[in-house]
Amino acid sequence: TDRMTSTASAFVDRHVGPDTTELARILDAIGVDSLDELARKAVPESILDTVVDGVPDGLATLPPALSEHDALAALADLAGCNTVATSMIGLGYYDTLTPPVLTRGILENPAWYTAYTPYQPEISQGRLEALLNFQTMVSDLTGMDVANASMLDESTAAAESMTLMRRANRGSKSPRLVVDSDIFPQTKAVLATRAEPLGIELVYADLADGLPEGDFFGVLAQLPGASGRLVDHTATIEAAHERGALVAVGVDLLAATLVTAPGEIGADVCFGTTQRFGVPMGYGGPHAGYLAVRSGHSRQLPGRLVGVSVDADGHRAYRLALQTREQHIRREKATSNICTAQVLLAIVAAMYASYHGADGLRAIARRVNTRARTVAAGLQAAGIDVVHAEFFDTVLAAVPGAAHTVVDAAKQRGINLRPVDDDHVAIACDEATTEAHIVDVLAAFGAEPAGPGAESVPADCARTSEYLTHPAFTRYRTETAMLRYLRALSDKDIALDRSMIPLGSCTMKLNATAEMESITWPQFARQHPFAPSTDVPGLLRVIADLEQWLVDITGYDAVSLQPNAGSQGEYAGLLAIRRYHQANGDTGRTVCLIPSSAHGTNAASAVMVGMRVVVVACRPNGDVDVDDLRAKIAEHADTLAAIMITYPSTHGVYEHEISDICAAVHDAGGQVYVDGANLNALVGLARPGRFGGDVSHLNLHKTFCIPHGGGGPGVGPIGVRSHLQPYLPGHPLAPQLGDGPTVAGAPYGSASILTITWAYIAMMGAQGLRRATLTAIASANYIARRLDEYFPVLYTGDNGMVAHECILDLRGLTKDTGVTVDDVAKRLADYGFHAPTMSFPVPGTLMVEPTESENLEEIDAFCDAMISIRREIDRVGSGEWTVEDNPLRGAPHTAQCLVADWNHPYSRELAAYPAGYDRPKVWPAVRRIDGAHGDRNLVCSCPPIEAFA
């Protein structure tokens, strides 16, 4: 047989779509005899790694491939090395009780976790509605007007708040930001990292004592503070506004159910995390951060923003709003470099709020506060000083000289407390804290329970306003209702469980169940990121293995896993280059060369590290114009910091001059940043650290199988050569990482999903990884050959080959017929497919990436759909249909529109089943959405109940 079908099959045979027979057909169609010949034809000889017995250079040190069963057993052994202690450390990370219906219905459900960012809103209405619920939840609890669709974590959300206030406060020329001295230490570190390249001066102050002297553009406060203290910031906000400053407050959303919302006392910005709303700590992540603003600042928001609009029939519909703020359009002038953040976790948090409702959240908060008050009362009864009388969940105990003794005593009882210094211990209570935990905590201090103490939320700070009154937070309080709601939403969306998602530059490959299974195991999921290292030897082994494997695969000398998105990897890599130049006395090296074809994130990241972007032209064939590059290098020889170059290029080809490009930059004293977005075309073939790169970020959510989650989570680790290693990210609470800049809230970023990539590499092995890469390239070339006569392939390499993706040029057809790339994308939904990437990197084109995971049947079905669409375009071109009324312009077609009055020149059958009745399809929930209407009439929270009538 072509493929073994027993459970003993090698994992690579489960992961790679085409079997032996299908692969032979693919190779025959593209004119090569083998995958090895394909490698020699597609990849420049100068960078191609040699292969011995099927194993490429660099990958020989990878362990032999494991079966799915053995990989899970190995992970279980590592999990068994960890200790699941009771975490009472706090600092923004808390144990939480995830409702099982959400674990099974979202986190373990491929209909949710294999979806992509909702760029095609008509087939993404389910997760867009869920994200609108998230935005409404955040807006309600913070008292703000507009919230975005998630941030990467709380600390980076604080940093984005800082830069947002500086942009928005046009009346202030001051570079100073006043920061609450009671802020979380990880947030303090991220703020310092982000502030320095931008020339922002951080001034720390105890806001309970008022504001410091002098001018400043903003104030950033924490509520409650890191010490647990609750402070009424009303006077601070009033004073700041009187002095022309804006105010951002980092507020705990569970506390906000009991404490007056910052928006109600005048805050301009709120930021924080939604982790404790049902999202496990996961040794640091992933969790959904949040950012909310007053309506006047909505166009300054970073990241995605879901808004309400209408479709072609006037029905309510959801879409991503105000996209012109973002890096993929505004490039170096964008509000931020972040793309999508933490959609999957935002949906969990939103559904947690829906499941519990306002009264349920309030009851949880009161229980948490009662536990903390019981701790405080017991300590005081034993004569131990409680530093703050006003707190929500965290008690600060003064134990002169005995902090570590107390922490050790608690540890012997299975509880992790936080030693603030030698004289103080913090005890943080959460949803999972029990009365038995309180008894053990007090025993560690030599105390015992004395009943709940006095109220610790002062009456003048108590919340009186309503929140979460929308039906989205009242209808789904039973498991039956929630189960059906989750199913109804997911049925509106195309994810990988329904069809291929051929998005170029996105690498929508299989997210195997065996890779995913461990993320909910408590030995990984219930670990606090600042837990003692003795609790997590298994997790640290996973991290160490993964760092070494990625070093082997990329050819670099060291890897950091801290960046929790590709954008953050870019930032960390460029920051390493900046600090390297500074250490060498080359402070004037601030120019970053970026090809005109680059993803907008590159330019946005360069600006964030204080670099000046100089654009390098591309040739008509898509390659970097080496003559223009040399001219730009000569022009900026003394100030050149780096070049950022994606390889293979964003045009989907292997540029044969890559080694010369790297050498030219190095000769001028610059560094080479090789963007790893397209690493799925390099693994096992060539290593950026060996063909000229000094640093790269990798996208574990593309190449290494972490799912996209509808728009996050992602992991963007960076690999560096040895001279940049001293500048890899550090962390104030993880001294083993060194003193480099902190780029994320947790030392190892989104650590709990690193087990996915560990499992993928462990199960594929060296030969499997190389086979996957070459199969992805073969499939892309097959599509290019099949579709070229219908939609010209815009760019190919020297041998007429593309890399792992190809660009289909529709511009001629649009000019001749008026049918646009948007029309084709929407029409594909009628055929049951998600559209390829539209108009990137070239307007008026579609970029197709099949990955290695799709079999030939699915690839052919996609090609057949595209060919059928071309025939429809020809009917428009011939005049049979007008450009205003044809199945492409009318797409997508809903079931509702088919049963309404029909006055189109094409049949209902052609509208609904253009591919015939055999292929199952997701019916679009709405017709084509009016984007301009949504931006003109910005609504970013759940519509009022009347809108549903």
Curated annotation (Swiss-Prot):
Ubl conjugation in keyword set: no
Subunit structure, as described in the record: The glycine cleavage system is composed of four proteins: P, T, L and H.
Name of the protein in question: Glycine dehydrogenase (decarboxylating)
Gene behind this protein: gcvP
Sequence similarity: Belongs to the GcvP family.
Key words of the record: Oxidoreductase, Pyridoxal phosphate
Stored PANTHER family: GLYCINE DEHYDROGENASE (DECARBOXYLATING), MITOCHONDRIAL, GLYCINE DEHYDROGENASE, DECARBOXYLATING
EC number in record: 1.4.4.2
UniProt function note: The glycine cleavage system catalyzes the degradation of glycine. The P protein binds the alpha-amino group of glycine through its pyridoxal phosphate cofactor; CO(2) is released and the remaining methylamine moiety is then transferred to the lipoamide cofactor of the H protein.
Oxidoreductase found in the keyword field: yes
UniProt catalytic activity: N(6)-[(R)-lipoyl]-L-lysyl-[glycine-cleavage complex H protein] + glycine + H(+) = N(6)-[(R)-S(8)-aminomethyldihydrolipoyl]-L-lysyl-[glycine-cleavage complex H protein] + CO2
Modification sites for N6-(pyridoxal phosphate)lysine: K702
InterPro entries documented for this protein: GcvP, GDC-P_C, GDC-P_N, GDC_P, PyrdxlP-dep_Trfase, PyrdxlP-dep_Trfase_major, PyrdxlP-dep_Trfase_small
Example GO molecular function: glycine binding
Listed cofactors: pyridoxal 5'-phosphate
Biological process according to GO: glycine decarboxylation via glycine cleavage system
Entries under HAMAP family matching the protein: GcvP
GO CC annotation terms, alphabetical: cytosol; glycine cleavage complex
